[in-house]
Amino acid sequence: IMKKAIVERLKGVYHQEWFPETGASFPLRVAFMKDEAVIGLDTSGVSLHKRGYRQLTAKAPITETLAAALILLTPWKKDRILVDPFCGSGTFPIEAAMIAAGIAPGMNRSFLAEDWKDLLPRKYWYYAMDEARERVNTNIETDIQGYDLDGEIVKAARENAKLAGVEQLIHFQQRPVSQLNHPKKY
């Protein structure tokens, strides 16, 4: 219904009877509040919380965006210890490692707008990705640890960290929280 209404409006504005359905797709999002409609162009495609690295998940995974936001709200910095005693599929340790290494959130995914060559030439996406890659530094010292009681989910966390490109920055181990100790104080 929304598509039909938009096309009818465009017909009047551009004095055309027909708009061919060729070229790139431009998905629209429509939200209503009382008597107002807000129309937005979806440039991302898949939701932004899907970073592209998490193939395997635990029963109650936290979204990547929420994990990153919570980490950024803490006093944690890359030179400080970070321990997740219930790491599940590794979202908190992986997001912390990505922050520490300067890996941009969208590095491992694609965006719908990348195919819109007429609006934004692909070279600009390449420039942005090159700039983001230049900021990455995985040759850093970190003390990021993830523990979980479930050995299979620890394997999944390791695999997710590998897919994110930060496996060397995180120590994952199967361990119950009752055995959690560390010589460093946070």
Residue ranges of model-derived segments:
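Non-catalytic, mostly N-terminal accessory regions of nucleic-acid modification and defense proteins
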Residues: 1-65, 71
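Sequence-level detector for tyrosine residue identity
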Residues: 14, 53, 124-127, 147, ...
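Short, charged low-complexity intrinsically disordered segments located at boundaries
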Residues: 31-43, 99-102, 123-131, 186
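Conserved S-adenosyl-L-methionine
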Residues: 62-178
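Local beta-strand N-terminus motif with an aromatic residue
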Residues: 79, 185-186
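Short conserved loop adjoining the S-adenosyl-L-methionine
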Residues: 179-184
